[in-house]
């Protein structure tokens, strides 16, 4: 208290020129950490760490490291809260001069901003990174839904949007299957994408995307849909799908015509023996390339099943669905008439459909907000259940 008072007095003597900043709004993560359950969780972690340091308990080195990071960050949060308390005491003290109280009010805003930052950092420390958070490979599957030709055009626009997003983020974009429509648009597509933390950024694009607009050849508003699936692809396919775990059958490729169709058995069907899951691949001219693609596709499907099984064990109030459940959920509407894109999961609307579809800053902003919501969901689950290990 004395130290804070001396700091304010020194500033007053120097007659510093002070600039007020806008008030800081608390995030959902901060609210959780400031709650009774949040404080209980942090106290439990600090107590467990103290017991280990005193030799009264034991824990794995990685567990102790996790507790230490939370304990150190929570100490910074405690310091910030203490400073705020001291400043508010000065503000409410009638014996203080008006100048001193004004300086304290300005400092309150600055400390609140710093405290919000420290709370956000504490949230990141509490929610540990898992393999999916750092996965550098994923597969994006697009399928046109209701709406006929308009749905195919919209699916093509989404495909272009994600390709531009990949370019912006310097991701590798590898089309595995693309079913283009002669009149324009895409019926379906399967893309392998790789890059730093690509799955973490793309996973919440999974779901039903809806477009509302007036087609060029009509005067009425049309509503069309496209479905997006985002599957995690393992870093090492052979670990998830060993060669002896599958049955590979050669087939003749089918298609509209050409030298290679029905003449050579280049297409393959790969069946996972344990689960019976089968994938077909015939887009490449050479069989070994189709086999490689089939392995990747099967590995992604099996990894998705593992993710689904893991999520089934978690009972929480998550706003964002991850995995197979997300595919049937209507997640976003692109309204051309009102030039607005709305994500229904986080109740976020952004103006500028064209910029959004061109993978501009607005798309990046929405992806970041979805990641923040995911962090909040996981933080809520950990704190509510006091999961300290």
UniProtKB/Swiss-Prot annotation:
For molecular function, the Gene Ontology terms on record are: translation release factor activity
Q: Identify this protein by name.
A: Probable peptide chain release factor 1, mitochondrial
Q: State the compartments where it is located.
A: Mitochondrion
N5-methylglutamine PTM positions: 259
What is one GO cellular-component annotation here?
A: mitochondrion
Q: Which gene encodes it?
A: mtrf-1L
Q: Which Gene3D superfamilies match?
A: 3.30.160.20, 3.30.70.1660
This protein's major location comes to: mitochondrion
Q: Does the keyword Transit peptide apply?
A: yes
PTM section of the record: Methylation of glutamine in the GGQ triplet is conserved from bacteria to mammals.
Functional note: Mitochondrial peptide chain release factor that directs the termination of translation in response to the peptide chain termination codons UAA and UAG.
Instruction: Give UniProt keywords alphabetically.
Output: Methylation, Mitochondrion, Protein biosynthesis, Transit peptide
Family membership noted in the UniProt record = Belongs to the prokaryotic/mitochondrial release factor family.
Specify the superkingdom: Eukaryota
Look up keyword Iron and say if it applies: no
